[in-house]
């Protein structure tokens, strides 16, 4: 499967607006103090399309004022979900997440029991909301919660497998290249597998996402075998790496938490250290 850089970027949909605002892990969370007075905002989708199946759906969103993503927002966003007939099927609520990222986000989570097209509405939004699609599992090409994660021989320190550089995190490669994904899955240990390119990410979230996972790696040690695969095979970002095609991905970053070869949790596009630690702790519980 061949995916061009343009196709990879396009797969993230409206996530391109985020890139222009330059999320950077070195920024302080102090720049994103909640502003409870924000109203009339547009919902900026920070989730991929065509990847959701019935069950628990995570919808990370940011908020914007016309064309500008806001660096402040309410401490909590509340709202509801409508089905294709505009019937309300769920209420939702999510706290702001802004630890060491410039643009805060709210990870909305809702349980959807059947495929369909839905609309997320939030109190104080501009009246339009944000659409999302839940598909029959047979129509989803990427691994999802409950499906197996296929093994793949990802680049390691000892064998880059044609990916140069094998890790674009700076100032030095991340420590998550000691074993391949195949070896990690075969070990029987819980596995965390992240695909993302810190150097060429178009959403501005890949470098902080990987840095947060490295910190989690230091915290939990060998309780989880962690593996990273970069997105491009070359430093010019002209050729998509085989690891991306192996999963059928058209967006990044993505983190899979896996037990006994089965995906237990999948986190898409954006997370901060707080949310990541919460999800890893739940994964290990």
Language model regions located:
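Non-globular targeting/processing and membrane-anchoring segments
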Residues: 33-186
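A short, hydrophobic beta-strand/beta-hairpin element that forms part of a small beta-sheet core
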Residues: 253-264
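Non-catalytic, surface beta->alpha helical segment in thiol-disulfide oxidoreductase systems
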Residues: 263-285
């Amino acid at each position: 499967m061949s995916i061009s850089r343009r196709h990879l970027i396009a797969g993230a949909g409206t996530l391109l607006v985020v890139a222009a605002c330059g999320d950077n892990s070195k920024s302080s969370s102090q720049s994103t103090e909640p502003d409870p007075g924000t109203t009339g905002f547009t919902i900026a989708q920070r989730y991929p399309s065509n990847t959701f199946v019935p069950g628990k759906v995570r919808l990370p969103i940011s908020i914007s004022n016309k064309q500008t993503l806001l660096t402040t927002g309410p401490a909590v966003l509340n709202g509801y979900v409508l089905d294709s007939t505009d019937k309300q099927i769920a209420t939702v609520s999510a706290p702001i997440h802004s630890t060491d990222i410039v643009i805060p986000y709210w990870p909305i989570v809702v349980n959807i029991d059947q495929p369909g097209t839905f609309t997320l509405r939030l109190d104080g939004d501009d009246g339009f909301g944000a659409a999302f699609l839940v598909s029959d599992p047979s129509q989803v090409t990427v691994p999802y919660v409950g499906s197996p994660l296929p093994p793949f021989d990802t680049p390691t320190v000892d064998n880059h497998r044609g990916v140069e550089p094998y890790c674009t995190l700076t100032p030095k490669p991340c420590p998550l290249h000691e074993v391949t994904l195949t070896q990690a899955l075969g070990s029987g240990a819980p596995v965390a597998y992240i695909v993302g390119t810190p150097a060429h990410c178009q959403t501005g979230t890949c470098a902080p996402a990987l840095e947060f996972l490295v910190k989690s790696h230091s915290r939990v040690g060998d309780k989880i075998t962690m593996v990273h695969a970069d997105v491009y095979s070359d430093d010019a970002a002209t050729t998509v790496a085989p690891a991306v095609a192996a999963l059928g991905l058209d967006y990044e970053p993505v983190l899979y938490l896996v037990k006994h070869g089965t995906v237990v949790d999948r986190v898409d596009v954006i997370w901060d250290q707080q949310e990541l630690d919460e999800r890893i702790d739940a994964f290990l519980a």
